[in-house]
């Protein structure tokens, strides 16, 4: 979710001549989000920023397709940004660059704006390799939050991109309660949390994008590991 930080472009971007809401900005945001698997978002973001600063071509779909093999992607990308699953990230990086080149003129912005209907846009995002409900929802939130597409509607029909931290928060706040003394398997309740948080937002007429930001702040900084127990 730290990919939204890229709306406030830092020195790395300025040195590379990157303007806010430009194609390069979109490429960085899209490819960075692909690595949000079991990695603390702030660390992921910083490593991706360093990689972009040293070699922005690694985020350019045309260049990726024409120049990188899977082994290259593992060595030059996955290992540099500390991917939990280096081979899988490399496969996703290459495959998704191919999709962007073939269907969106190598420009993620065309994909971001391919529909204003959130349900269709999330379906498009999830058609990319390695993008499921969580990462798709995270990218959707970033697309809206950064301003790449300000006309998205039906957001209330898209599930909130939660993870184990959000599930843990639900129990910590007693939004979820189970009637036994066994240690809770928080992973088991992630999907339920996703559905219930969306229902609560819709009942209260609250945009889940705002709730998701609050949950991320709590989950990533205040409710991690033994801090929640």
Locations of regions flagged by a protein language model:
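Single conserved hydrophobic/aromatic residue that forms the stacking wall/gate
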Residues: 2-13
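Extended cationic-aromatic binding surfaces that line active-site or macromolecule-binding grooves
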Residues: 14-72
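Conserved aromatic-histidine-acidic binding/catalytic patches
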Residues: 18, 22, 36, 81-88, ...
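Short, hydrophobic/amphipathic alpha-helical patches that form generic packing surfaces
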Residues: 19-43, 95-98, 141, 168, ...
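Short runs of predominantly hydrophobic/aromatic residues within well-ordered alpha helices
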Residues: 22-31, 89-90, 136, 162-163, ...
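A general alpha-helix detector
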Residues: 29-33, 76, 120-124, 165, ...
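Alpha-helical ds-nucleic-acid-binding substructure associated with the helix-hairpin-helix region
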Residues: 52-146
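Accessory, usually C-terminal, subdomains that scaffold auxiliary metal cofactors
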Residues: 143-229
